Amino acid sequence: LPACICSGPSFVILTVGEQLLGSRSAGVCLFAAQVLAGWLTAALLCRVRGIPEPLPAPPAGAQTEPPPALDSILAQSAVTYLKLCGFVLYFRLLAAGCGLLLPEALAPFPAMLLEVCSGCDYAARTGLWASGLCCAALSVQGASVLLQVRTLCPPEVSLRPLLWGRLLHLPLSLALFYLGLPQDAVESFNTLYARVVP
């Protein structure tokens, strides 16, 4: 699970990199850092915790129920999709509220903890540390993503490895991001001015 939670390449490369930071190459470096940090995090967690025992197979007699009907599957899918969208909207509104109440320099931090898109949006406006803060926002993922994962996973799947994974992922992704950038790119990304939106 810790290696699977990552924002998609189109969001990271095109939206965060190209649109928010003004550089597609920054987006590629961000995405590469996120994927590599996810793999390293999963490898470290497997090394520390060991490979988990597989869940026991259900008894043969328990499979006598007929499979659910197609209409109930579609209805359940629609409800789940609405829950996922609801988490994004709810935490985006909370992040926007924090952005209005807090000074501009502090606005990215609660946004990062609440919702990844808001975190990247506020982080990109900081100028000096925009690329590093966007990397941190992508690594943390926010409460919205954690609740989306909780909604999609069955109750017997623990989120504890994912939470530990996020703690490991953050320093790894930042280190990989800055190690993977050429020095002149680091200097130019760290001196970006806040974007002006007409």
Name these PLM-found stretches.
Residues 9, 13, 87, 91-94, ...:
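Alpha-helical transmembrane segments of polytopic integral membrane proteins
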Residues 49-75, 188-197:
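Intrinsically disordered, low-complexity non-transmembrane regions of multi-pass membrane transporters
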Residues 26-42:
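Alpha-helical transmembrane segments
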Residues 27-32, 85-86, 133, 163-164:
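Hydrophobic alpha-helical transmembrane segments
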Residues 10-11, 35, 39, 130-198:
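C-terminal transmembrane helix pair
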Residues 1-2, 10-20, 118-126, 146-153:
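Generic transmembrane alpha-helix signature in multi-pass membrane proteins
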